[in-house]
């Protein structure tokens, strides 16, 4: 496996997903600072824009709903589903075809999180997917967007951290890691969000944190 050029962080959010990264080969200064990936996504039929966030919505269109070419992405893929901004917009018009809050379903111990139960209120003739599959599709889209913009540094070769809520049970934690592996994320660390927030504060303080906390202090993280 190649040596990682970048350290990547993914926020697989309930409402939005985001990917940030640091160039490990860069020195001090702007080149070595954290950056945000602008994610190419469909914003209308056949229309692609780059946004700083990927809305965590999956839309399962009727086979006759879209014209040929409407779902083509910059990297050549033409899936039979939509994620991101267009999914959110179409889903507002036809909610029975919209998968949302997959992250919340992923930590719902009362359902089979591998079963095709979403959209929950959709009739049988509408396509369904599992909370696990929905999470995987968001991660796949981020992977493809990254690889499209960084062909010499494929995501599978990079060091990657995915944040999860502290409330996730062990099963939800493992399902998140499973979705990441299925999406081609080879080197994955799953980190709880409060811990990630603390690390971010330490990094942004540029050493000043040592003057603000002492050994034995309890730090409150508010999300």
Role assignments for model-derived ranges:
Residues 15, 52-56, 186, 216-217:
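Short glycine-/polar-rich loops that comprise or flank the Walker A/P-loop
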Residues 2-30, 206-223:
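Gly/Thr-rich phosphate-binding beta-strand-loop-beta motif of the actin/hexokinase/Hsp70
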Residues 1, 39-46, 199, 207, ...:
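Aromatic/His-enriched, Gly/Pro-containing loop or helix-boundary segments
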Residues 14, 24-26, 64-65, 167-169, ...:
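Conserved nucleotide-binding/hydrolysis micro-motifs of P-loop NTPases
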Residues 32-183, 192:
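Phosphate-binding loop and its immediate beta->loop->alpha context
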Residues 181, 185-203, 210-223:
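Small-residue (GG/TT-enriched) beta-loop-alpha framework at ligand/catalytic clefts
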Residues 20-22, 172-176, 200-204:
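Short acidic, glycine/serine/threonine-rich loops at helix termini
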Residues 27, 68, 147-153, 205-212:
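Alpha-helix termini
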